[in-house]
Amino acid sequence: MTEMPKKTGRKFKFFKFKGLGSLSNLPRSFSLRRSSASASIRSCPEPDTFEATQDDMVTLPKSPPAYARSSDMYSHMGTMPRPNIKKAQKQQAVQKAQEVSRESHLVSRRLPEPPDLEAAKEAGEGTEALLEDTAPSAVEVDPMRELEDLTVDTEKEQVPGDVSPERTAAELEAAGDYVKFSKEKYILDSSPEKLHKELEEELKLSSTDLRSHAWYHGRIPREVSETLVQRNGDFLIRDSLTSLGDYVLTCRWHNQALHFKINKVVVKAGESYTHIRYLFEQESFDHVPALVRYHVGSRKAVSEQSGAIIYCPVNRTFPLRYLEASYGLSQGSSKTASPASPSGSKGSHMKRRSITMTDGLTTDKVTRSDGCPNSTSLPHPRDSIRNCALSMDQIPDLHSPLSPISESPSSPAYSTVTRVHAPSATPSTSAQPASPVARRSSEPQLCPGNTPKPPGESDRAPHASPSHTLCKASPSPSLSSYSDPDSGHYCQLQPPVRGSREQAAGETPRKARGSGERQKELLENGVSDGEWGKTFTVPVVEATSSFNLATFQSQLIPKENRPLEVALLRKVKELLSEVDARTLARHVTKVDCLVARILGVTKEMQTLMGVRWGMELLTLPHGRQLRLDLLERFHTMSIMLAVDILGCTGSAEERAALLHKTIQLAAELRGTMGNMFSFAAVMGALEMAQISRLEQTWMTLRQRHTEGAILYEKKLKPFLKSLNEGKEGPPLSNTTFPHVLPFITLLECDSAPAEGPEPWGSTEHGVEVVLAHLEAARTVAHHGGLYHTNAEVKLQGFQARPELLEVFSTEFQMRLLWGSQGANSSQAWRYEKFDKVLTALSHKLEPAIRSSEL
């Protein structure tokens, strides 16, 4: 019994030895199979037989491991073992890691050159030698094992020993650029049919959408826009790359490319109503297409100084998405930085195009790769950009001390902040911190660099901030040549001051300047002799009316006349019936603009007023006489039109036809001419109680002139109501005379006649209406030059008839209504007297129905 276990143990030991020996001999018996394996196996070292594990890829299946799950070893079909599942999954993971590794270094690694025949033979012989050599003296590492290590530890990078960390970082950055480049390349590789279809879809959008206009080119560089405008009069609109949300008008005039910035502001018309306006010099528009139509249609110069006229749009032939990708690629690949700059790698522009805003900088400022070559000494590339980029706040100051934005009133209705730079007392090169209030909160304080200035601008440099000192002290050779592609030199929208700079430097800067002084400085800009820049002229307070009845000379009315002479009334009726409503509206508008000092303002008148335009004078204390004159003209115009209607003693059809023409006149004044003053006067005549009670006349109007009745009831009356309540206003680009009646009535309420409850008289919304009109007055005062320009455009080429101009003059109307004697009476007496006359005329045409007759 004792010998049996020993014999069994000996047999077991012998079997174990033979089994292990046979397993260890497997690689030698299958050497031919190993010779046909991949060439990469030649670097695999051959350790001792009992110490090394065999490769799964090139050996026969080994015995199953000691511990195995049933799901790994046996299938659901039977008990057949399947030990290769884990190995197949591991092999797939290794192959996937290998593909990822190859893609990540696709750009940085150079592809090996294809070997020739001799090299292939040598490689084959070397492979056989390595396969036969099993000594542990091999030095190279198995690439498959390297990939396995990569999959286990993903955070550990395999860096060759001869490659520096800087090179590896550059390769990784280049790999990121390659991914971004592929995205842009996908856009550029679109088929022409797809691009053409996309362009058609953009052009089919609403006309108010900027993308629907072919002259809009989106975000293209400044240099590209200059190459697109080739002939005088060519123009295009592009996005401002330095001021987010603004646009730039690029045109060519006198063989020179000019750039004009279009500022976007938010105008607060009421407490809860705001709308966006686009300011351009002294003009304001609802949208950019309206600005383009205005300048192209009127052939008005874009700026007074340059005299540039735009009339030939440069249309785009590709969609906006394609243009941005195309010019972005060309810009990023063409610009190279100095070797010392960390952002000088190729493709860095495309990598950083995805940045939208960094510390107030727009994309173009961040993506510059040729900024400061010595920026490696700074802690972060963003600091170098902050110190070397141009500030939009200082670009206008390099040209003129008066920025176009500086004209905007200090009103919460405007999003831009008034920027006034007082002249320094003595020229100084020391750095002084600038006030943070002098710039917009969304714009950083940046270094202007050594931007070249026009001649004579060296003594007008703005105060430098600490960042300015840092940038000026930098010995960078390329700093002087730095120029932002979009923020460069915008053309001046205001003429430069021609006064003596020495006197301006010697004077003490005033801390606060009123509206009159500021506008007087604007007035001085256009003076050739510079006399107004030396002394200040006190405005003259007018005490007498501009309507001088004593010196009035007329071709239609005699020197002495009685009120409402029949022959004179008949003559006026004939003159009004000879022309259409539009011609009448032009005559009325011309006289209105002359009275309100929108047109015909001379330099002497501006000196006496202290301001440039009558619209600003209306809001000032010494403009009281002008306010009274406008109130006189408004009521006199309404009464004369009412007399014209009530004096028609013919049939109801004749009065209805005259009523229809009056409605057409109101529509022309509102729409075609943009004259809200006379529009309100005509509507005031139609809404008089003496006219609105003529039921037969209005019934005939609805039957014979239905469109006129609908126009009056559905459009004109609601529009006038919204004007009086301060809820709605006409577009500034189409306005020649704004609706000034509410606020001049508020300012002169003790002198205005009582005509019933006003919109601001209600207890519910009275205060809101008053505030809306007072804020509208500030807007009116600010846009006096715009109304002047619009009036000149509307009346350009207009040949007025002297008789009609005289009929619509206030002196003629006063003489016609009250005679030569009564015209000099008090205003209250005249209005009260004529109210009774109008009531009598109305009852004569359509007597009131008595209660006994019902």
Curated annotation (Swiss-Prot):
Modified residues (Phosphoserine): S22, S354, S435
Low complexity: bias regions: 34-43, 333-347, 400-415, 422-436, 474-485
Deletion consequences: In one study knockout mice are viable and born at the expected Mendelian rate. In another study the majority of knockout mice die after birth, those that survive show severe lamination defects and loss of cellular organization in their olfactory bulb, with a reduction in gonadotropin-releasing hormone in the preoptic region of the hypothalamus. Mice that die at birth are morphologically normal apart from a marked reduction in the size of the olfactory bulb, which exhibits abnormal cellular organization in the outer layers and a lack of innervation of OSNs.
Cellular component aspect of the GO annotation: axon; cytosol; ruffle membrane
Tissue-specificity statement: Expressed in the olfactory bulb and olfactory sensory neurons (at protein level). Expressed in B cells (at protein level). Expressed in T lymphocytes.
Keyword match Phosphoprotein: yes
Molecular function, one GO term: transmembrane receptor protein tyrosine kinase adaptor activity
Family matches, as PROSITE patterns: RASGEF_CAT, SH2
Stretches with biased composition (Basic and acidic residues): 99-124, 508-520
Residues covered by region (Disordered): 34-129, 330-384, 398-417, 422-520
Localization per Swiss-Prot or TrEMBL: Cytoplasm; Cell membrane; Cell projection, Axon; Cell projection, Ruffle membrane
Reported function: Acts as an adapter protein that mediates cell signaling pathways involved in cellular functions such as cell adhesion and migration, tissue organization, and the regulation of the immune response. Plays a role in integrin-mediated cell adhesion through BCAR1-CRK-RAPGEF1 signaling and activation of the small GTPase RAP1. Promotes cell migration and invasion through the extracellular matrix. Required for marginal zone B-cell development and thymus-independent type 2 immune responses.
Protein name: SH2 domain-containing protein 3C
